[in-house]
């Protein structure tokens, strides 16, 4: 009821940096837009995927991405983290995963990039990972719709989460409908 919602609102810390991570087409942007409607997050900044905008600027995406392009994506994530209270639909984990799978980036550059980028993982208070299991790929005209590539990015993200879990205070897997995911997020951040 209303009293329950009111109690929940009181227990959410004022300033939190919350990131959603996961491969393409798992509902990250949809979820951020839904969280934006909640009174609990009325004082938050929200950042959603800008790949279409960046692609329009001439920055190559997905397997065609370059070191320069991935550096722009990393800078965007860092800019988001300059906000005290932010909810974003991409994290540093995502940026590293896409960098690892870019064809034109040399292996040693990928390693240097990862080593540098991972330092910013400490900034997140919460990261929520969304699995692609059982979810179809939607074509938004920009994202990669190749199932194999989506699985590779997911594998890279989950591997990075295991590798660097000690650097993030709270990493939680969420699943289900948008409503169920919201409930899971609220349960974690209010505890």
Annotated model-derived regions:
Residues 5-7:
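Short hydrophobic targeting helices and cationic amphipathic motifs
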């Amino acid at each position: 009821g209303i009293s329950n919602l009111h109690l929940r609102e009181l227990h959410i810390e004022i300033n939190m940096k919350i990131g959603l991570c996961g491969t393409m087409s798992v509902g990250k942007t949809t979820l951020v837009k839904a969280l934006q409607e909640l009174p609990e997050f009325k004082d938050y900044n929200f950042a959603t995927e800008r790949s279409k905008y960046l692609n329009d600027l001439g920055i190559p995406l997905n397997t065609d991405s370059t070191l320069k392009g991935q550096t722009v994506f990393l800078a965007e994530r860092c800019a988001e983290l300059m906000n005290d209270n932010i909810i974003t639909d991409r994290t540093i984990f995502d940026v590293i995963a896409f960098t690892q799978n870019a064809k034109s980036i040399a292996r040693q550059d990928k390693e240097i990039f990862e080593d540098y980028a991972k330092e910013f993982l400490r900034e997140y208070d919460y990261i929520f990972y969304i699995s692609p299991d059982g979810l179809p790929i939607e074509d938004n005209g920009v994202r990669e719709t190749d199932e194999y590539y989506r699985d590779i990015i997911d594998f890279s993200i989950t591997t990075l989460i295991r590798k660097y879990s000690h650097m993030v205070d709270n990493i939680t897997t969420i699943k289900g409908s948008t409503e169920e995911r919201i409930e899971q997020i609220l349960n974690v951040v209010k505890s």
